[in-house]
């Protein structure tokens, strides 16, 4: 869709940016899931699939005994691990941001189509036989599809971070990504010579995307000025 369309999206309500929701210090705030994503992923550095959110917030993890796996899907023996569900809509935020930047800002039109086409024409499921390998491969293919180095963006979003966790999603299973896998993707992107995405891309949303489209430079401020601390929140 286009942001200024008044058809499918009415007068321009965007759920991730406009819904009043959130947790903890961000509870009851407009765009609460965006706030959660920035706090959990960008600031705290929590892996993408383990970022807490409004749905399932406060859920007590369950102890589950399963066969452990390594990054290649090899069974390592029985382990008891903690597992619980996390907010699925918080996971959507970085992909919405990529849609805004590539399509709405017209920085890489067709990037998603290129990604999908690459899977249709060349994908070996036996090679990418684990969730971790598939996650890394998705990021690689997306960067190839748009010709841009998005490693810093993916890392801040929590996608390009080591993880070894049993994920309770629509179906349960291990997601294992090692530091070596992350480093390999970074080396690949650097070898392609792709230009880097803007450092602040993790902050793009439906209401500031024109600044990213026009590459507006922010005026330098003075440290300590422009914000005030109110009840443990910076405003």
Tell what function each PLM region has:
Residues 1-6:
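Active-site recognition of the HExxH zinc-binding catalytic motif
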Residues 22-166, 175:
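Active-site-proximal alpha-helical
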Residues 130-235:
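Beta/coil-rich, acidic/histidine-enriched accessory regions frequently appended to metallopeptidases
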Residues 9-18:
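Short, glycine/acidic-rich hinge or "gate" loops at secondary-structure transitions
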């Amino acid at each position: 869709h286009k942001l200024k369309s008044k058809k499918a999206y009415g007068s321009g309500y965007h759920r991730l940016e406009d819904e009043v929701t959130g947790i903890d210090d961000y509870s009851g705030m407009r765009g609460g899931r965006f706030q959660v994503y920035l706090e959990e992923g960008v600031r705290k550095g929590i892996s993408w699939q383990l970022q807490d959110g409004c749905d399932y917030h406060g859920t007590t993890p369950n102890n589950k005994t399963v066969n452990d796996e390594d990054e290649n899907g090899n069974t390592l023996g029985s382990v008891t691990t903690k597992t619980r569900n996390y907010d699925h809509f918080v996971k959507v935020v970085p992909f919405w941001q990529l849609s805004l930047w590539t399509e709405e800002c017209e920085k890489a039109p067709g990037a998603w189509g290129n990604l999908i086409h690459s899977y249709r024409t060349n994908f070996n499921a036996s090679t990418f036989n684990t969730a971790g390998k598939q996650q890394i491969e998705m990021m690689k293919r997306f960067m190839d599809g748009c010709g841009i180095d998005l490693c810093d963006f993916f890392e801040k979003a929590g996608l390009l971070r080591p993880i070894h966790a049993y994920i309770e999603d629509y179906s349960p299973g291990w997601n294992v990504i090692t530091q070596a896998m992350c480093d390999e993707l970074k080396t690949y992107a650097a070898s392609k010579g792709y230009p880097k995405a803007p450092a602040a891309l993790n902050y793009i949303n439906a209401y500031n995307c024109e600044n990213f489209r026009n590459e507006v430079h922010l005026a330098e401020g003075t440290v300590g000025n422009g914000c005030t601390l109110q009840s443990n929140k910076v405003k």
